[in-house]
Amino acid sequence: MKKVITYGTYDLFHQGHYNLLKRAKELGDYLIVGVTSDYFDKSRGKFNVRDSLMTRIENVKATGFADEIVVEEYFGQKIDDIKKYGVDIFTVGSDWKGYFDYLNEYCHVVYLERTKGISSTQIRNINNLRLGIVGNESVLDRFLDELKFVS
């Protein structure tokens, strides 16, 4: 049996998360998904996570792709989990390309292409804009459409 493991925060769960988990599952027979704890996120400087740990776990569970879900709580846990669960493949999104190459010592590392045009950061930014703009809804919609073309 080929075991695959992936990790993420999975905040504001969206199609990109779903696609990544689906492709991770297709890499093997058994998928373990690590969801970062609130404490671990904060220790890495991620202070803008909106969803609770339980909500994020439930969202991952609802996809039906995860055979097992673990909570990532500390630096170095990836190596410990790979050894503990006898993992064959570690996978994450291509935005991390090269960052986890050191794990090739323990298993095969695969970087999956991200879903273009969506991220939790983009969703947060759009929600912040919506909260910060008062006025006609059609003006807001046009403004948000125009943002797609401005970098």
Where are these regions (language model features)?
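Nucleotidyltransferase catalytic core that binds NTPs
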Residues: 1-151
